[in-house]
């Protein structure tokens, strides 16, 4: 009997071993077929063990393939064959270019625990076959093009810990059975078309930490049950149609770091239990119907960096206790019914960057201590009842980008100290007050200012000629004052509508219709006066000429000697770079197939030599780094490491890893990073042909290579496709410009700087103008009035790039006239009596009729993109479609 038992066991053992070998051969054949279809980098069937291939892990004794990670490889093709790897437990296909329907055969991967198909272009419905994956713990199909409802067949996935379906076109309601997923920690379904109520059953999910449902059409109340288990850390419900009150139970979740419930229809008061949430970092409840007083309990949330209660019905005074929030960076209380004085308690805050108290009923005076806040960039106090003088200490706000004091009851004169605010860029608004006296000439020092409004005051005297120093000025308004004399000859003034100067009875000259009435005799006298001065100057000049000539020769010799010494010193410095190289705090290369080729120490060393610098942009300088392996990478050195990066280093790294999986043919993704001291270096693929700015505006210096129209159109389409993809995955670019349209070895356009919108504040999902003002010439006009970087704003900036491509002109040129940029110059062509053909680069448009016809069609697209009204601009997806149609014009 024993013999027979042993024999049976041996036979079974041999069979199992045979089956194991057969399974291994089957997996290997499947992987070879997958590689043939997808072309996976680093996979080779030349006798190597497939278990060592990049992105693969096998089980015990290299038995079966249990993990397949092809994330971020920009792969295309059919992925159905993957379903033949029946022992898979972990499948990550995120960040590729896979399209079509998700294979239903994935439902046969019965061992699967982790499935990530996000950041692709899958279409159709969510396969009901996923309901067969009973062991699934993580399920992510976000940022695709999926439609339909969340299928009920998924309700049996009781082990789910992460359930992410965001960024699709899903409709229907959130299934009630989500509340039965007892292990659920993360549930995200934002940016879909979901309707109905948030299921009360979600309150039964004891492990829920993150709930993000923003940008849907959800209705009903916020279920109080979601707070009662006490583990919730992030709640994002913005941009829905939610009603009712914020439940008092919110205070149970002491670990909550972010509450975002703005853009809903919520009512009632903010519960005082909010003070129990000691870890709260962000609280956004703007654009609701909340009422009552702003509760002082917010002061107990010591980590709070953003408090946004704008556009509600709050009344009462601003709690002085808010001054205890030493980490507060943005305080936005605009559009309420707050009264009383501006509390002095928080005016010494070392971190406050934005203070928006506009459109309330505040009274009292502007505290002179207001500018003791060293980081303040945005000060909005307009539309209140503030009285008194503008304090002279306002000049201490040297970092301000925007100052809004309009529609108050301010008196006195405009302090000349405003001229010290040299960073003022977006707007200076002093309109609708009772200011008197003359305009201080010091305003002319504000050479970055885009918008100036001093209308509807009691200002007297003439407009100072020194205001011509405001070289960036686009919009001005001097109307309804007591100004007199001629309007200075300054292009921004003459290009402004006459309404900007009306209501000043004694003001004359263009753009006003009233002439200043100078006589010919006076003109003649002035001419003779000028001639006399010229004669005197000529005599003096001839006497000085000899002296200057001798001096110049001496100086040239001295300068040459100094330069030679400096050059020698620089050589010594560069030779000592290796000895002084700082220690690396953190660093990584995200792509496995590049890790061996990139030396992080060599990366740091390369950025310490000026000879390696390729370019300097709005946020960073770019260096060329040659690795010991011979590989060349581009290294982006951030100009100044943002506070949020240093405070949220782990979040920054996760954000970079996520962005490294953003695979698109027309995007430059980060491939790694290095952090040392307070410096962040971002690694990218080296692109040898520079950027679009160099191609268009410097090619005239290189007549041997001029980009023709087909190449330019291809670049325009590529850049548009890259930007459209960013918008699809809910990323707003912060600096769309021709210098950020980079060119690979085949002159294919790829959009750079995509990570900046996240790295300026990686802990937040939104980008605000308080982080960036953009590149001059590309800034949409509405940014002077709004505080949000938007998709329509990106479209405008892209339109400027397209105009550059069509006209070969820079965004700002002296030829346009002061205060006139490329957009205004193009849109004003008809008023100048010019035809659209005259706007185009004649070197291209006159080559052939076909080229001219395509260029005129593309010009129409550019004009739509640069419409002054954001709502009238097309979406980038539509821009791509229109430009592709241009390519097909016969």
From Swiss-Prot:
LRR repeats lie at residues 67-85, 86-108, 110-132, 133-157, 159-181, 182-205, 206-229, 231-254, 256-276, 278-300, 301-325, 326-349, 350-373, 375-397, 399-421, 422-446, 447-469, 471-492. Pfam families: LRR_1, LRR_8, PK_Tyr_Ser-Thr. The chain crosses the membrane at residues 535-555. CDD domains: STKc_IRAK. The keyword Acetylation does not apply. GO terms for cellular component: plasma membrane. Residues 608-886 form the Protein kinase domain. It is found in: Cell membrane. The keyword Translocase does not apply. It catalyses: L-tyrosyl-[protein] + ATP = O-phospho-L-tyrosyl-[protein] + ADP + H(+). Disulfide bonds: none annotated. Expressed in the vascular strands of cotyledons, the shoot apex, hypocotyls, roots, leaves, stems and flowers. It is an enzyme of class 2 (transferase). Residues 556-890 are cytoplasmic. It is a single-pass type I membrane protein. ATP binds at residues 614-622, 636. Glycans are attached at residues 46, 61, 78, 108, 140, 171, 180, 276, 289, 303, 363, 429, 477, 498. PROSITE patterns: PROTEIN_KINASE_DOM, PROTEIN_KINASE_TYR. Keywords: ATP-binding, Cell membrane, Glycoprotein, Kinase, Leucine-rich repeat, Membrane, Nucleotide-binding, Receptor, Repeat, Signal, Transferase, Transmembrane, Transmembrane helix, Tyrosine-protein kinase. The active site is at residue 735. Belongs to the protein kinase superfamily. Tyr protein kinase family. This is Leucine-rich repeat receptor-like tyrosine-protein kinase PXC3.
